[in-house]
């Protein structure tokens, strides 16, 4: 895959996250959030490193408030790992790709890779 998908509806979240057959990173963010802009290139690195083994999506909490509330997102960026439709790990704040990998346990979740950052 290697690209980041914008989620703009509950149906898209259901399809691209909850029904995904591969692990999914969900970046809960907002356009006005400075740290969210800082973490964006780090997520691009992860998308490139993991390719087809991992999906990365962005959920704008201003557009998708119901999803953010459902998952108890109180700070952004919140970066969550979903596996088989379940939230299994999360990290909060702007972090380097390698730290995000460690916080989310990505190597064990995908059986793969490591970001080059």
Question: Can you say where each PLM-predicted feature lies in the sequence?
Answer:
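N-proximal helix/coil linker or "cap" segments that precede and/or mark the start of modular domains
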Residues: 1-3
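A short beta-strand-turn-helix
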Residues: 5-24, 65
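Short pre-active-site segment immediately N-terminal to redox-active cysteine/selenocysteine motifs
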Residues: 21-22, 28-32, 75
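Hydrophobic beta-strand anchors of alpha/beta hydrolase catalytic cores
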Residues: 25-26, 56, 79
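The canonical Cys-X-X-Cys-His
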Residues: 33-36, 79
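Typically the conserved alpha-helix immediately C-terminal to a functionally engaged Cys/Sec
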Residues: 35-50
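Structural microenvironment flanking redox-active thiols in thiol-disulfide oxidoreductases
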Residues: 54, 59-68
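Non-catalytic, surface beta->alpha helical segment in thiol-disulfide oxidoreductase systems
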Residues: 75, 80-116
